[in-house]
């Protein structure tokens, strides 16, 4: 009997340990994303016009875009914006982000801002961050980020009704006009080099 009592605490310890190990592990909850919105407009021929958004170091750059038509002179005028281009909406996890570049894709040619730049903004869970209007001048020499909230937001709410119930957490400064983003541009072509065959 005394020998049984001596091992009883060990038995209870093992039993409690087994019960604890059978409990389901707590699952981490992820905060709902925020909504990043804005518009991209241009005064040139067709292509895919993009805005580069960076998060934490090591994360891939996200690029909301408008356009992309293959025919260079097809109509890309947005009837609501009354300009060539369009609006964009992007879901991102809550956190701190930066606008770091702009770029254009036309056929096999990629063009992007000549120098990096940074415009910081915040994304909050379940809220809207309005980045403004990225506008490309005819020669891409004075690409600007402008406040067009009074025009853009009603259009965005009409196109994405779920945004109408959300609070705006961030917006570009009222009447802002940030000019010459990236100080010009640089281009790169992906046309493959074909080695000519020697004449026979």
Locations of regions flagged by a protein language model:
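Sec-dependent bacterial lipoprotein signal peptides
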Residues: 1-19
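Primarily secretory-pathway and cell-envelope proteins
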Residues: 19-73, 104-200
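Short, acidic Ser/Thr/Gly-rich low-complexity loop/linker segments typical of extracellular
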Residues: 68-84
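Short consensus segments that form the blades of beta-propeller domains
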Residues: 79, 88, 109-111
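Short, surface-exposed beta-strand/beta-hairpin micro-motifs centered on an aromatic residue
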Residues: 84-91
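A short tyrosine-centered beta-strand micro-motif
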Residues: 93-101
């Amino acid at each position: 009997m005394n020998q049984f009592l001596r091992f009883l605490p060990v038995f209870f310890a093992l039993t409690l340990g087994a019960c604890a190990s059978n409990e389901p592990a707590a699952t981490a909850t992820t905060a709902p994303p925020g909504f990043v919105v804005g518009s991209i407009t241009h005064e040139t021929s067709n292509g895919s016009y993009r805005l580069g958004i960076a998060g934490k170091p090591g994360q891939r750059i996200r690029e909301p875009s408008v356009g992309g038509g293959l025919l260079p002179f097809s109509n890309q005028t947005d009837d609501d914006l009354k300009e060539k281009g369009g609006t964009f909406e992007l879901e991102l996890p809550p956190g701190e982000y930066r606008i770091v570049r702009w770029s254009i894709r036309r056929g096999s040619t990629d063009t992007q801002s000549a120098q990096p730049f940074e415009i910081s903004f915040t994304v909050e869970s379940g809220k809207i961050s309005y980045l403004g209007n990225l506008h490309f001048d005819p020669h891409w020499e004075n690409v600007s980020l402008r406040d067009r909230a009074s025009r853009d937001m009603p259009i965005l709410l009409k196109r994405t009704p779920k945004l109408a119930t959300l609070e705006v957490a961030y917006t570009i400064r009222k009447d802002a006009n940030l000019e010459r983003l990236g100080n010009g541009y640089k281009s790169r072509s992906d046309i493959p080099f074909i080695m000519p065959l020697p004449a026979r």
